[in-house]
Amino acid sequence: MTRRTPPRPVDVEQLFPEVAPLRRQAVRLHPRAGSPSWRDSSVGGPLRWPDREPWPLCPEHRGSPMAPIVQLYAADALGVVEFPPACDLLQVLWCPRAHDGRWVLPEVHWRAAGAVGTVREAPPLPAGTPYGHVPKPCVVHPELITEYPSWDLPYPLWDALEPRFAQVEAETGWDYQYHLSTAPGTKLGGYPGWGQDPQWPDCSGCGKPMDHLLTVASSEADAAWTPFEDEGVRYESADLMLGDMGGIYLFECRSCPGRPVKDRFGS
């Protein structure tokens, strides 16, 4: 089944042409409880991990195995993120235990699916893994959407547009920040779903601002962003509980070799 986000009831760029140059494409993954295999893109599902490679272990927790979080084949990225040359598979894992100043410790791997060969089964997670830090297995339903900055809107522009934001909300009931700009949920590309001031990282190598790669979110949608197919339907998703219903935001530098990664937490 596909998932389709209802179109916004107003033309954002017509009302606020100043945000048009800041538009970004994102892919809402719409994870829903299921039984994916390693042949599928998934959230919390089995990874197409080569048997010849050791399973990643956390360096801070006595070699505790990392948990599979997201697997995405290039076909399901819908062109939003350019994969490294010869790669068509993105895999994200993390150690779900608390770390010094961080909620989780993630790793990002790019690989060629056809070169994997025999697939290694993930080791079981240790007892005491925090509840809500590892997603339940979900199939995904990739959907291409357009986003505009919310918390990432530059302060001078926000101040200039705020009277029009207020006018549109008064006339339509639609708030720019929560209804018209940035989609909630687990997604590729676009803007992070910040709940407060942005913590956009710079690359330690080149010093440039990093690109948003992926948001892994506790909540998938509110009423305004619920797909048509889920309206009035009770559904199960990844059952994550990251802090106070927050999210983990992964960033990468696409200019430096190896595409180094940093993460941020937001609630």
Label the predicted regions.
Residues 1-267:
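Preference for intrinsically disordered or flexible, low-complexity segments
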